[in-house]
């Protein structure tokens, strides 16, 4: 079964006719550059599920405007960022402004994963109520470990009281240490 359709698209006022109401206005400037007869893909906006933006904290390397321009140029309108930025995304009151600036300056819809534990240290839960109020779509400890499984259990229970989704990597530092395992004969040796 094919997931592509080979068809012509009629562009009117810089927007495809059949999709005029479905496309966000942020892509209108991109569609203005289409040339008649060019072979291009017409896709819904793409989603980057783990983008590493440089703002907040490292604006000397990239701003929301420059990162947004790069994302839009490649078809990405929705960008999800993990909490392990500098500073860590654990303050709900700052998140709304960050999302608004990403849309205004960069033309992208920013979706934020807040910090699951305070400072991403894996010791105690962060203020998940404040993060939800600030507009986080979920919480995560990024790739940082939890102190132990009890901390993980408590943070999962706390996040559940607010209906927050949790993204985490299954790693128990007391078991894994610096080791790795592979499936197969060597792992069971």
Q: Model-predicted segments: where are they?
A:
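Active-site-adjacent beta->alpha loops and helix N-cap segments on the catalytic face
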Residues: 88-98, 145-158
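Functional cores that coordinate and move charged inorganic groups
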Residues: 136, 152-187
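Metal-associated gating/positioning segment near the N- to mid-region
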Residues: 37-102
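Short acidic, glycine/serine/threonine-rich loops at helix termini
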Residues: 91-93, 122-127, 151-153, 176-182
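N-terminal metal-binding scaffold of metallo-dependent hydrolase/deaminase domains
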Residues: 1-37, 42
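Active-site gating loops and adjacent loop-to-helix segments of metal-dependent hydrolytic enzymes
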Residues: 45, 74-78, 97-109, 173-189
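Divalent metal-dependent hydrolysis catalytic cores, especially in the metallo-beta-lactamase
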Residues: 66-90, 106-118, 132-147, 163-171
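Short, acidic/polar
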Residues: 60-68, 120-130
């Amino acid at each position: 079964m094919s997931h592509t359709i080979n068809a012509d698209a009629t562009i009117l006022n810089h927007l495809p006719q059949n999709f005029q109401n479905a496309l966000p206005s942020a892509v209108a400037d991109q569609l203005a550059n289409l040339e008649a007869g060019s072979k291009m893909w017409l896709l819904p906006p793409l989603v980057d599920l783990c983008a590493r933006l440089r703002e907040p904290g490292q604006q000397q390397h990239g701003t929301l405007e420059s990162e947004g321009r790069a994302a839009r140029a490649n078809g990405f309108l929705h960008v999800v960022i993990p909490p392990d930025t500098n500073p860590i995304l654990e303050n709900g009151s700052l998140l709304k402004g960050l999302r608004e600036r990403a849309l205004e300056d960069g033309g992208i819809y920013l979706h934020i994963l807040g910090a699951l534990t305070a400072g991403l240290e894996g010791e105690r839960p962060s203020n998940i109520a404040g993060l939800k109020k600030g507009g986080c779509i979920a919480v995560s400890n990024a790739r940082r470990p939890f102190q132990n499984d009890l901390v993980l259990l408590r943070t999962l229970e706390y996040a559940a009281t607010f209906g927050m989704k949790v993204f985490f990597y299954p790693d128990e530092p007391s078991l894994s240490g610096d080791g790795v395992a592979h499936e197969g004969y060597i792992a069971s040796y």
